[in-house]
Amino acid sequence: DGLWYVTTLNIGPIHDNSLGCAKNLEFRTQVFELKHLKTLSFFNCFVSPKRHPIAIPSNSWDKLGGSLESLEFRSNPGLIGKIPVSFGSLVKLKSLVLLENGLTGNIPTNIGNLINLKRLVLAGNRFVGWIPDSFGGLNELLIYDLSRNTLSGPLPLTLGGLTSLLKLDLSNNQLEGMLPSEISNLKNLTLLDLRNNKISSGLTKSFQGMCSLEELVLSNNPIGGDLMSLEWHNLHNLVILDLSNIGLTGEIPESMSKLKRLRFLGLSDNNLTGTLSPKLATLPCVSALYLNANNLTGELNFPDDFYREVGRRFRAWNNPNLCYPVGLVSASHVPYGVKPCQQQVTLLEHDLRTKLANGNMNQNSQFVASLGFTSYGFGAGIWWVSLVEMLIGLFLNCFL
């Protein structure tokens, strides 16, 4: 009887005291007889999707409904098939993690019955279909990760009901439509990652109410919109902001320089215009600033210290009308791919020509006056020696 009083069963290289995975491991139904089981984990056990594919048993999960609090299948490429509908009977579950397996099909709507869930991770599989609206009732949820699947359809409006949520990652799917205004209810959210989807309809002002956000990643979506439409000082906790390749237009607001905790700012591959405020270079924590492939113009008046600190993590190339002032930047810190301001280059060239011309006139006068070449200074360079040789030849021709 003591065997059946097992509360934790970890199989695979999870902890030092975990059970090892047997070769060609099968999922035994005896597991469902462990009526006191609270934790069940399989890590890197089912690894051969072609030679030895394994499906999660579709029945008997209700036998663990009164005890199981954590169920995890991680890194099992040989684990195939669908999520069993009977998972919906595991009403005491606090953590459901199905990460990087070979699972397919739609996500069962009755997962929304697991109202005690604090962590729901279904990332790195091949799930399809829409995100169930029923997930909006998971009021205790803290971690919500459905990334790296093939989910489609709009973002559910019920997302706004997840008021306890800390991290929401729906990246790398095929989600489309607009960003629902209901996300403004997620006051505790610290991470929102929606990159690599098909979300559109512009930046929503709902972000302004999400004052706890530390990471906002929307890159590679046809969102569109204007940075000027948001009051960036409300997002003062941002550490990572990636809005690359989302179809932005308009100018980069000076108010973004108030994001004092910002370490990464990605605005590349958009249609941004106008000049850059020098205040962007005063962001105290920034270590990467990507502005390349836009239509920014004017002088890049960032101090030399900024380029020394950030180096190649400052990207501003492919802005044809953007330039840097020659006098403000040392040769070793020239921003990569940005040209020097042409007016300054022209002035420098003009000054150089003037000095050279004046130098030639003075040297020629000394040469003609002396006739004995005693006034000539040979430190002027080899090109001047050539000129002297030419003049000597002309002089001799006149008297021979």
Regions found by a protein language model. Give the residues of each.
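Plant-biased, solvent-exposed loop and capping regions
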Residues: 1-383, 393-400
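Regulatory modules of eukaryotic transcription factors, especially in plants
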Residues: 387-391
